[in-house]
């Protein structure tokens, strides 16, 4: 059986490490993680409100918002602030908290 090594390091927990509306900071250029059930995603190390740093998955929607704000080169995102949005959504037939990420001045469509 072919297995892939999963991404190392501690991952953030929405609602514990940060809350809706918090401002975090991107600390690296990110890396692609194709483990898991929902396809490839970008993982960035971020600085949390308590000054700790942990890994955070950026979904495709979040990536698109950040590309609009900061450009297509993730190396240039290092040191940039991001705003986290925690939204209850139906995922795999159950309500779950989904984290979206934008630049601080951006709004999520439908969340104005």
Task: List where the protein language model places each region.
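OB-fold ssDNA-binding interfaces and closely related basic DNA-contact patches used
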Residues: 1-55
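Short, structured beta-strand/loop micro-motifs enriched in basic residues and often containing a Trp
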Residues: 59-68
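A short, structural micro-pattern
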Residues: 38, 76-78, 93-95
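Acidic, gly/ser/pro-rich intrinsically disordered tails
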Residues: 1, 5, 106-112
